[in-house]
Amino acid sequence: MKERAYPVYTVDKHAEGLLVGGHPWVYENDILHSPENEPENGTLADVVSTKGSYLGTGFVSLKSKIRVRLISRNANDTFDAAFWRRRVEYAWNYRKTVLEPADLSACRVIFGEADQFPGLTVDRFSNILVTQTLSVGMEKLKPVLFPILAEVLRADGQTIDGIYERNDEALRAKEGLEQNKGWFELPGETHPASTQTEICENGVYYHVDFENGQKTGFFLDQKYNRRAVARLAAGHTVLDCFTHTGSFALNAAAGGAARVTAADISAEAIAMAQRNAQRNGLTNMDFLCEDTFELLPLLEREGHPYDFIILDPPAFTKARRTVENAMRGYKEINYRAMKLLPRGGYLATASCSHFATEELFIKMLRAAAKDAHRQLRQIEVKQQAPDHPILWGVPETNYLKFFLCQVI
């Protein structure tokens, strides 16, 4: 190990166990000794055990409960531009390995801690990279890292016309960062005039509004789950709740569904879903601007004949303390869907909340089925697409549950 110049934090046995097990976060409560002179916010520091054993190097976040986010466990690493270029190349080559070539034009290029870029998300939508930066260390690294992102993809023959930042996320306040959004100025380049682009996924085209859409503009993690729905949808009458911009509904319609109803509480989302249907020439679709919690019991009372229902709601909980209320919400919509479906119908149901674990989700589905006097026959259980990799030792990276079942 070469001589180190970074400040040193000594952590307790609890933190040591987590770090050795693969987790990259050091909480302030687990720190036994801090450097005599506190490092500057967003700079690097080493982390060691009570015996002085090196555990890793990471970015310091002085305003967060997560005091250090590791970026390396190699004491000989030098964190220069070449280091970050290698890491971007590694992340991109991973996507090229696990995704089909056609899916590389709309994929998650960087998935935060799972790619060893703590607090950074980078999504590719055709010719645009859309970023979200949720840690002060990554915020300070942008002038070095973002040009490298564009350079690495371009060197691989990919067209990248600009980088757009979606930093309008409340979590930034926990890092002492302001909320904002706008184009990142790549040196010597001009960015596109439009903040919309088009992507193709599973043969379906989508308009993506990366300035105003949810998160970075489009949910890429369900790409292969949408394909599973499309395979099963042929000939069915489908209801897609929480449709957002129509992704599951469009896949069902393109897959040969007899009729698809796409519902969402957001008028803006429904307008974009209608635009996407027109773009794909799909005429077997209807659209409802409705609250799913009110819509499902109404449809049950009116006797609407749907035999395939899709439930892909936004996260009902983003904290452990609200899990119980969230599970009640998940149970309500799943119970209502099971009541509405005929025996032999199909239910695709998902949760994108890390705190709503698979164990809790299955328990909820069993309770909903019992109350609805139905049984569930499991067809497929899936997770997020592999461009959102799950890093063992970091449970926060394992968040998406997707169940495709027959209701009998």
Where are these regions (language model features)?
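Conserved SAM-binding motif I beta-strand of class I
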Residues: 259-264
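Non-catalytic accessory regions of SAM-dependent methyltransferases
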Residues: 1-126
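S-adenosyl-L-methionine
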Residues: 268-310
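Conserved SAM-binding loop of SAM-dependent methyltransferases across substrates and taxa
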Residues: 245-258
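Conserved class I S-adenosyl-L-methionine
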Residues: 235-244
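Mobile active-site "lid"/loop adjacent to the S-adenosyl-L-methionine
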Residues: 306-336
